[in-house]
Amino acid sequence: MSPTQAKRILVVDDIEDNLSLLEAVLMEEGYEVDLAKNGELALAKIEASPPDLLLLDAMMPKMNGYEVTRRIRQNKRLPFIPILLITASEDANAAQGLDLGANDFIRKPIDFDELMARVKASLRLKDMMNSPQ
């Protein structure tokens, strides 16, 4: 992926180690990465400059990933942003995220090959939706 084609991904997680690890993996694949430590900061960043994709932890204090997803999908001023929720393996509410507008989810512990496949598929979908018919 050339620098002019680099897609920007916003990673949202309340755990610093998770942010650092995901940032390193995504940057190694050639993506531009922006980070947010909570849902409120993520919404502010999205409204200021919508990313190409959102990688969003489902369980965070104050505003969880489900609420962030709901607010993004209700905001008609925002362009389409693919949302991948990161859920704990025991999270029985993963389907709730899809119902609220998330496009996909991945369970912890994260398989990074699977993560990259899902990221690429979501970005392809966005490109197809944005291309002239």
Where would I find each of the regions flagged by the language model?
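Non-catalytic signal-transmission and effector/linker regions of two-component phosphorelay proteins
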Residues: 1-10, 123-126, 130-133
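Active-site beta3 strand of CheY-like receiver
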Residues: 49-56
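Receiver (REC) domain active-site loop signature in two-component systems and cognate sites
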Residues: 60
